[in-house]
């Protein structure tokens, strides 16, 4: 067994692992990266964020072509199969892998492909993909192994008609009807993708509202948009059993209902990838969801072991994971780059997009904060009329006395980009965080950014 010595070993090359490895390397540490795949990038690049967003982009282009009257001169609406749109996602994945591989090489981070597990608090045994076992010894170790879809034991995921959010990328046909169980972020995003391909979607939600953490008006807008686009949402339903057939699948619900479709996509929960890490060898224990507990510096109960990304739970976003990994390494090497990552924008890539940051109306009402609301509807924006993306709105919540911006919520095209203007103002200290910025600033015209000015005037006009 070959033995290699490092200052830092990072387990997992997703966003959290990458952020950690790069920051530690920039601080002059000798760093090794271990990943169970034969390529870097983690689930985010290969099965999650990147392929699903690439799929969404392709589907959105198809929708634009099929709904724009200008293109009728070219021909009738055209439809593409799921495997067809998947080809573009595969090209994006290859480009991402190439880029990220170059990052590690440029920063002189050694990458080991294989399954890593703790031998003790300072040693990692790596069973490489070629079967060779190598030992990595390090002063400090960061766990960034991510998560995977939760799979109930009573569901046969080997059945050819039953998928989860990892295996759905192997779907070789376009189903006429699809059941999606679980209406969280992943479930809603795939509901948009498949409905955009003309698939009838049954979206089964075990709660009474879609994405209940969102501002209720935004959640309602998504529900309304789904109902107009081949998505049947069923709230307050729980599965009793899943019956796989040769020609489809039947979902039996505890309410007594039965739903039949060509395929089922399971999107109900995720579990941390900790079961093969040998945590018992260092006295560390994961919770029931496979997640490990860390403090505000991302340190676990083992003093030289840190955690970041999905494996530590909330908020389970790629954007936050990268910052958590970078901050964990910053805490570890003490180079001033540590921060506790808690003020994170939400980006949900449905069609149209949803994004938000800060408080929603329910939270402000519960806290008895005197707030006011300003809105800008995209249908009245010149840029939206030009692009044909007229569905959506920008909503700003602000303190009616100090004019401090308290929350920004957006539903519509480019929402995940638009929200960052509000985020930048909300991060300003003291009186610099004010609605006055939006009315005293000249925005390019026509842009979607000027929705902030429209929403600001709308809100300020409500004051008395």
Curated annotation (Swiss-Prot):
One Pfam entry for this protein is Pyr_redox_2
Q: Where does FAD bind?
A: 35-44
Enzyme Commission code? 1.6.1.1
Look at the named UniProt entry and state the broad enzyme category this protein falls under.
Answer: oxidoreductase
| A molecular-function term among this protein's GO annotations | flavin adenine dinucleotide binding
* Entries under Gene3D superfamilies matching the protein: 3.30.390.30, FAD/NAD(P)-binding domain
Q: SUPFAM superfamilies attached here?
A: FAD/NAD(P)-binding domain, FAD/NAD-linked reductases, dimerisation (C-terminal) domain
Q: Which cofactor does it need?
A: FAD
Co-factor binding comment: Binds 1 FAD per subunit.
InterPro entries attached to this UniProt entry: Class-I_Pyr_Nuc-Dis_Oxidored, FAD/NAD-bd_sf, FAD/NAD-binding_dom, FAD/NAD-linked_Rdtase_dimer_sf, Pyr_nuc-diS_OxRdtase, Pyr_nucl-diS_OxRdtase_dimer, STH_gammaproteobact
Where is this chain's protein located in or outside the cell? Cytoplasm
Alphabetically sorted, this entry's keywords are:
Cytoplasm, FAD, Flavoprotein, NAD, NADP, Oxidoreductase
* Main location as per UniProt: cytoplasm
Give the UniProt record's GO annotations in the biological process aspect: 2-oxoglutarate metabolic process; NADP metabolic process
Q: What does this protein do?
A: Conversion of NADPH, generated by peripheral catabolic pathways, to NADH, which can enter the respiratory chain for energy generation.
**What is the name listed in the Swiss-Prot or TrEMBL entry for this protein?**
Soluble pyridine nucleotide transhydrogenase
In the record, what lineage is assigned to the organism producing the protein?
Bacteria, Pseudomonadati, Pseudomonadota, Gammaproteobacteria, Pseudomonadales
């Amino acid at each position: 067994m070959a033995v290699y010595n490092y200052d830092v070993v990072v387990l997992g090359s997703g966003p959290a692992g990458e952020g950690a490895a790069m920051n530690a390397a920039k601080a002059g540490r000798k760093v090794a990266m271990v990943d169970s795949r034969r390529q870097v990038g983690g689930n985010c690049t290969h099965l999650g964020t990147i392929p699903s967003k690439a799929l969404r982009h392709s589907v959105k282009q198809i929708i634009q072509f099929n709904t724009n009257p200008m293109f009728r001169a070219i021909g009738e609406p055209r439809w593409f199969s799921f495997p067809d749109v998947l080809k573009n996602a595969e090209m994006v994945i290859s480009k991402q892998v190439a880029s990220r591989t170059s990052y590690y090489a440029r920063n002189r981070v050694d990458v080991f492909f294989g399954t890593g597990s703790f031998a003790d608090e300072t040693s990692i045994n790596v069973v490489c993909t070629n079967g060779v076992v190598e030992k990595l010894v390090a002063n400090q170790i960061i766990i960034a192994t991510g998560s995977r879809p939760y799979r109930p034991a009573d569901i046969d995921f080997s059945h050819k008609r039953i998928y989860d959010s990892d295996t759905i990328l192997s779907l070789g046909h376009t189903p006429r009807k699809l059941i999606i169980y679980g209406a969280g972020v992943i479930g809603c995003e795939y509901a948009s993708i498949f409905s955009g391909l003309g698939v009838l979607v049954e979206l089964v939600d075990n709660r009474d509202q879609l994405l209940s953490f969102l501002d209720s008006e935004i959640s309602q807008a998504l529900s309304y948009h789904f109902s107009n686009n081949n998505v049947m949402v069923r709230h307050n339903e729980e599965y009793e059993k899943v019956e796989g057939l040769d020609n489809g699948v039947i979902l039996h619900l505890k309410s007594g209902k039965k739903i039949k479709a060509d395929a089922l996509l399971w999107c109900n929960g995720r579990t941390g990838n900790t079961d093969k890490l040998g945590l018992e060898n260092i006295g560390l224990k994961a919770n029931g969801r496979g997640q490990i507990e860390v403090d505000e510096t991302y340190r676990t109960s083992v003093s030289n072991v840190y955690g970041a990304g999905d494996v530590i739970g909330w908020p389970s976003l790629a954007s936050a994971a990268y910052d958590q990994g970078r901050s964990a390494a910053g805490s570890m090497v003490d180079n001033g780059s540590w921060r506790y990552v808690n003020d994170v924008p939400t980006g949900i890539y449905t069609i149209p997009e949803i994004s938000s940051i800060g408080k929603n109306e329910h939270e402000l009402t519960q806290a008895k904060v005197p707030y006011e609301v300003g809105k800008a509807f995209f249908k009245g924006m010149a840029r939206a009329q030009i692009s044909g993306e007229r569905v959506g709105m920008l909503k700003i919540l602000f303190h009616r006395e100090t004019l401090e911006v308290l929350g920004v919520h957006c539903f519509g095209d480019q929402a995940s980009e638009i929200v960052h203007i509000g985020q930048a103002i909300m991060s300003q200290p003291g009186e610099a965080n004010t609605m006055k910025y939006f009315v005293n600033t000249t925005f390019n015209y026509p842009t979607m950014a000027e929705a902030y000015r429209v929403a600001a005037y709308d809100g300020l006009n409500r004051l008395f």
